[in-house]
């Protein structure tokens, strides 16, 4: 089920399995949810809005310009550009596979996944005003991640998440990878350049505990040493 708010421009081609969304007003958002499976669809969202939203979330508690919630997905492609919401793309309680995720020029976070189980082939995110990737409360496997120009964190992992990453390339970012709040991450290979801190591990919320991080091949060039809060385990 596709729900829109404040009438964004939407074009759906069921034969090609494509959804094209254009946002031209600050409060416009799109929510895709419901029973069934979204199989081999391509979703694209663009925007001409330059202003910040006055509130982080709306009356429906949606933070994404594009939100997928309570839905199964298979081999979908998502692209988002010039988004102004708290999250350009937000997946909530979503399970399945993403073939490609491309996000450019987000005013705040690029990709945010909450309480989901996802297997993602390719992630390309450029120029996010906060975090490029935020993974919370779920199980996530990512094959290839390319991140550039993340004002705060390249990859933020929290709320008891379990994450496996094969290869990630991160540059022009404050913190390459942050692991928080009882989360676990295994990264096969990381290559980071022009970052302030490679790895930060800490507890942000009192109800959680320390975290675990393992990086098998670490080629990270940072300006400062890693921050590993007492109790967390890091091998890299």
Language-model features, listed with the residues they occupy:
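Extracellular beta-rich repeat passengers
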Residues: 1-236
């Amino acid at each position: 089920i596709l729900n829109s708010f404040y009438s964004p421009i939407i074009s759906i081609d069921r034969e090609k399995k494509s959804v094209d969304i254009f946002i031209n007003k600050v409060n416009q958002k799109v929510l895709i949810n419901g029973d069934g499976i979204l199989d081999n669809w391509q979703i694209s969202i663009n925007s001409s809005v330059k202003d910040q939203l006055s509130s982080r979330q709306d009356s429906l508690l949606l933070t994404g310009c594009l939100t997928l919630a309570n839905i199964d997905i298979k081999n979908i492609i998502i692209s988002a550009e010039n988004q102004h919401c708290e999250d350009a793309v937000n997946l909530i309680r979503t399970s399945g596979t993403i073939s490609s995720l491309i996000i450019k020029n987000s005013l705040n976070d690029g990709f945010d996944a909450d309480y989901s189980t996802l297997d993602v082939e390719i992630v390309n995110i450029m120029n996010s005003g906060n975090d490029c990737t935020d993974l919370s409360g779920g199980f996530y496997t990512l094959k290839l991640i390319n991140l550039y120009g993340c004002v705060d964190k390249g990859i933020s992992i929290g709320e008891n998440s379990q994450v496996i990453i094969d290869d990630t390339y991160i540059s022009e970012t404050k913190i390459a990878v942050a692991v928080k709040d009882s989360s676990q991450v295994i990264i096969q290979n990381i290559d980071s350049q022009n970052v302030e801190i490679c790895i930060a591990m800490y507890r942000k919320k009192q109800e959680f505990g320390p975290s675990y991080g393992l990086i098998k091949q670490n080629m990270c060039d940072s300006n400062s040493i890693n921050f590993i809060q007492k109790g967390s385990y890091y091998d890299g």
